[in-house]
From Swiss-Prot:
This protein may be expected to contain an N-terminal transit peptide but none has been predicted. GTP binds at residues 16-23, 82-86, 136-139. It is found in: Plastid, Chloroplast. InterPro entries: EF-4, EFG_III/V, EFG_V-like, EFTu-like_2, G_TR_CS, GUFP, LepA_C_sf, LepA_CTD. It catalyses: GTP + H2O = GDP + phosphate + H(+). It comes from Ostreococcus lucimarinus (strain CCE9901). This is Translation factor GUF1 homolog, chloroplastic.
């Protein structure tokens, strides 16, 4: 199969918020162009993981090639490059968009513009994509196309007057969308004579064939059997097989400029074929790589421990397998007095963390305990060195540190105007700094805050949803590090520090968090034969304390009357025994106490 002339290729992606109908629209387009036969159709055909189909989100990217005969009688190839919609995967989104020339902005005509839509549209504009609007779910009773068109123009500054009214479910407007793709999306430049440069926008591990890299040819031509080289990682390999996705793989001999395909060449690890890297020929390499490549850096860390310590090796093996497919996941062994042995894992964000945990439990049948998520702090020492830490136990003593910096992010919440007050209160409680408020329409508002990432990763999303009755949506982007007055809050149980319960928090919030911690532990730790003091302390200074009173055995029960000195002797002996027990007694803290403490959200009382 010869490669197609570039003027007949259209590369596009679909931008949408979760639940606005992106996957259903993709399914309908695949059926409309007869790329997928109706009998082979599964819902959300491009979402290959069960987890994606259940949650209705796109995690891993997929792409599909459709053949379409337009109204001008010409055959066009439409490459749909799917993008994940969630902020945790924004780097993957940006690389997918870099492989396109155009984008469909899909907005639910009953809901309107949401936070993630805004973020992804800005990414598309940064990549100079031609954007046109599709108002989906037009068949619903609550559909308000005129209001939503106005909102798109006001919020995003895009002309929505010629937006296509469609319903992917009811098959309305699909031909209009296909025609608009051909007319509006620019064809790729014809650069067949230049040295090969292909942009990897996805890669995954196939247990039988090694790493499969999905790419778009930017310049030059790729042929089966060519010796290839990755420009960022330097890995070299032979192109054993190249092909196109319909969405299943179909091998071809060569791919020209603008075409989208996959390559298999015995690559052993996804780390050698990273998203954003450039493929070129070993013999005739390109002078420079395509711009925009960066290594994904974990922003959120948490400890993952097996409930059964015998399954530690299974957990390690499962994490290694997931890492083959997901090089943004990092992990290292961690020993913990309460949980035993496990791993300290790094994730791109909270959704990434939830997905990894759920995949470990579901695909590898593991029972896991996950500790509270934390972020990476930069600790500057007095001797001029800098440590990046994510575990409170690694924080050096106050006399050795000059300052601590924590990551901040720009948070954008979009919500009905009725909930603005309560959402602003939540953001201020979480140390947010108000930046801007915009009325998107009479009923919907966008509120922007600069807020520490540590506050966002601890239950912020749940609190926002409960305060707005589920109507608010949010998006955040890391803006950099700032100096903060942070302290390490230790918990002492019977004078012994309980390391797993230590947290890094802001000094102003330390008292309320300490108070919540000690009160919660008092409820959960079983009573002993001696009094157990529970304290929250910063360094040597106790800021909150409580105690669990001792259980008392009635040692005088057998003395019926008789001499009082006998009772005194027994009570004295009991007191001495308790004193000795307090000195040598160990307090066993149950695991559910640790888990319950993880739910302390630290919102100021």
């Amino acid at each position: 199969m010869a490669s197609l002339p570039a003027r007949r290729i259209r590369n596009f992606s679909i931008i949408a918020h979760i639940d606005h109908g992106k996957s259903t629209l993709a399914d309908t387009l695949l059926m409309r162009t007869k790329t997928v036969k109706e009998r082979d159709m599964v819902k959300q055909v491009l979402d290959s993981m069960d987890l994606e189909r259940e949650r209705g989100i796109t995690i891993k990217l997929n792409s599909a090639r459709m053949d379409y005969v337009a109204s001008d009688g010409e055959l066009y190839v439409l490459n749909l490059i799917d993008t994940p919609g969630h902020v945790d995967f924004s780097y993957e989104v940006s690389r997918s968009l870099a492989a396109c020339e155009g984008a469909l902005l899909v907005v639910d005509s009953s809901q309107g513009v949401e936070a993630q839509t805004v973020a992804n549209v800005y990414l598309a504009l940064e990549n100079d994509l031609e954007i046109f609007t599709v108002l989906n779910k037009i068949d619903l009773a609550g559909s308000e196309p005129d209001r939503v068109k106005q909102e798109i123009e006001d919020v995003l500054g895009l002309d929505a007057s010629d937006a296509i009214l469609a319903s992917a479910k009811a098959n309305i407007g699909m031909d209009d969308i296909l025609e608009r793709i051909v007319q509006v999306v620019p064809p790729p430049r014809d650069t067949a004579n230049e040295p090969l440069r292909a942009l990897i926008f996805d890669s995954y591990f196939d247990p039988y064939r090694g790493v499969v890299a999905v790419f778009r040819v930017m310049d030059g031509t790729m042929k089966t059997g060519d010796a290839m080289k990755m420009m960022a990682t330097g890995a070299t390999f032979a192109a054993d097989e190249i092909g196109i996705m319909r969405p299943d793989k179909v091998p071809v001999k060569e791919l020209g400029p603008g075409e989208v395909g996959y390559i298999i060449g015995g690559i052993k690890s996804v780390a050698d074929a990273r998203v954003g890297d450039t493929i070129t020929l070993s013999k005739n390499p390109a002078a420079e790589a395509l711009p925009g490549y960066s290594k994904s850096v974990p922003m959120v860390f948490a400890g993952i421990f097996p409930t059964d310590t015998d399954r530690y090796d299974d957990l390690r093996e499962s994490l290694q397998r997931l890492q083959i497919n997901d090089c943004s996941l990092s992990f290292e062994p961690e020993q913990n007095s309460a949980m035993g042995t496990g791993f300290r894992c790094g994730f791109l964000g909270l959704l990434h963390m939830e997905i990894i945990q759920e995949r470990l439990e579901r695909e590898y049948d593991l029972d896991l305990i996950t500790t509270a998520p934390s972020v990476v702090y930069n600790v500057y020492r007095t001797d001029g060195t800098m440590d990046s830490i994510s575990n409170p136990a690694d924080l050096c003593p106050p006399e050795l540190r000059e300052r601590i910096e924590e990551p901040y992010c720009r948070l954008d919440m979009i919500a009905p105007s009725d909930y603005v007050g309560t959402l602003m209160e939540l953001a201020s409680q979480r140390r947010g700094e108000f930046i801007d408020m915009t009325y998107l329409s009479e009923t919907r508002t966008s509120i922007k805050y600069d807020i520490p990432l540590a506050e966002v990763v601890t239950n912020y999303f749940d609190d926002m949803k409960s305060r707005s009755r589920g109507y608010a949506s949010m998006e955040y982007a890391i803006t950099g590090y700032r100096q903060s007055d942070l302290v390490r809050l230790d918990v002492l149980i019977n004078q012994e520090p309980a390391d797993p319960l230590a947290v890094i928090t802001h000094r102003d919030r330390a008292y309320s968090i300490g108070r919540q911690l000690v009160d919660k532990l008092k409820e959960l730790i079983p009573r002993q034969m001696f009094r157990i003091p529970i304290q929250a302390a910063i360094g040597n200074k106790v800021i909150a304390a409580t105690s669990i009173s001792a259980m008392r055995k009635d040692v005088t029960a057998k003395c019926y009357g008789g001499d009082i000195s006998r009772k005194k002797k027994l009570l004295k002996k009991q007191a001495a025994g308790k004193k000795r027990m307090k000195q040598f007694g160990k307090v066993e803290v149950p695991q559910d106490a640790f888990l319950a403490v993880l739910s302390v959200d630290g919102a100021a009382d």
